[in-house]
Amino acid sequence: MVILGSTGSIGTNTLEICSRHGVSVEALSCAKNIALLNEQIARFRPKFVCVADESLASEVKILKKSQIFVGAGGLLEMLEACHSQKVVNAIVGFAGLAPSLKTQELGKSLALANKESLVAGGKFLDTAKISPIDSEHFGLKFLLQNRTAPNRLIITASGGAFYRTPMKNLAKVTPSDALKHPNWSMGAKITIDSATMANKLFEVMEAFWLYGTSRIDALIEPTSMVHALVEFMDGSCTAHISRADMKLAIAHAVLENVSENVVAHADLLALKDIKFHKINLKKYPIFSLKEQVLERADLGVVINAANEVGVFAFLKGECRFLDISRIVLAAAKRFADVKIETKDEIFAIDAEVRNFTKRGLNAKI
């Protein structure tokens, strides 16, 4: 298979699954973590390698029979060169959209961890041919197998790093504070997205595209033991329960059959601590966009672009935590009537929103 974003949290866990089950790895890609990439090359011996930063390409220790590609264009060229029919897209951010589109254009199977592909480009992807690498959407897929049409889909959120932090203290929190997720070990961006609830908004949008319904809600479940629930028309409700470990969703997305233990079973006696809570829209204002984006899915491009600018500015110390939500809401208002007809328009709108957001952060709109 091909693993895009192999040095990140999803990528490294996917490689462990490949190693455990004897799956050969034809190609790897990464952004900047060349040291880890070189370790992966030595261990998995891929035929093709791609690095996003061309200036780092000389540091890649490719094997004699390997070929190296560079940049966003090189990544698409690498996909064309690969014979593997399975592509795991674990790239972070909007940069993952073009590879997702290319993967399906080539007729390859897409195991998708890149949320932004569906958030920004869901209308141009064949979602029936996507295997989601996400605990919530894997849970929904599991619960919906061979069942009648659901009444409502429910995904859960932990509440992120600041779930128990008083709202009055949020103005002063730092990136290091925000990166302390209570339950999951994830990359920096998704951990910040969890703290603002942007991640859950994105997952609602993913569920909209994957399962073809706008009857989607999210609740806070602080233990991260219950990942998804499905309510059926007859009044019954089922829940998907497992430990907070992405290897479960990864294994089901990349393997033909999963017939052995992947993660330790959940401690059922610990379920006594499970409680569900509404999402406080004053504390998590980004989530207030849920109904709007379910009605106008093209807004996903806008929300994602503004959020990426805000998150990375916060991580660099260029804005405050609350500025992320502020600028996302401002962009959603400014581009409320956005309409996207072609793939090219996605990239044009993305660029326009990023420029608006950067100006907004500087001007404190």
Swiss-Prot record:
Q: Where does NADPH bind?
A: T7, G8, S9, I10, A31, K32, N33, N114, E116, G187
What name does the UniProt record give this protein? 1-deoxy-D-xylulose 5-phosphate reductoisomerase
Q: What does this protein do?
A: Catalyzes the NADPH-dependent rearrangement and reduction of 1-deoxy-D-xylulose-5-phosphate (DXP) to 2-C-methyl-D-erythritol 4-phosphate (MEP).
Manganese as a keyword?
yes
Q: Which UniProt keywords apply?
A: Isoprene biosynthesis, Manganese, Metal-binding, NADP, Oxidoreductase
Top-level taxon in the UniProt lineage = Bacteria
Extract the InterPro entries matched here. Answer: DXP_reductoisomerase (IPR003821), DXP_reductoisomerase_C (IPR013644), DXP_reductoisomerase_N (IPR013512), DXPR_C (IPR026877), DXPR_C_sf (IPR036169), NAD(P)-bd_dom_sf (IPR036291)
Which HAMAP family does UniProt cross-reference here? DXP_reductoisom
Give cofactor(s), names only.
Mg(2+); Mn(2+)
A single Gene Ontology MF term assigned here is: manganese ion binding
User: What Gene Ontology biological process does one annotation of this record name?
Assistant: isopentenyl diphosphate biosynthetic process, methylerythritol 4-phosphate pathway involved in terpenoid biosynthetic process
Binding locations of Mn(2+): D134, E136, E203
Please name one Pfam family that this protein belongs to.
Answer: DXP_redisom_C
> Which of this chain's residues are annotated to bind 1-deoxy-D-xylulose 5-phosphate?
K115, S135, E136, S158, H181, S194, N199, K200, E203
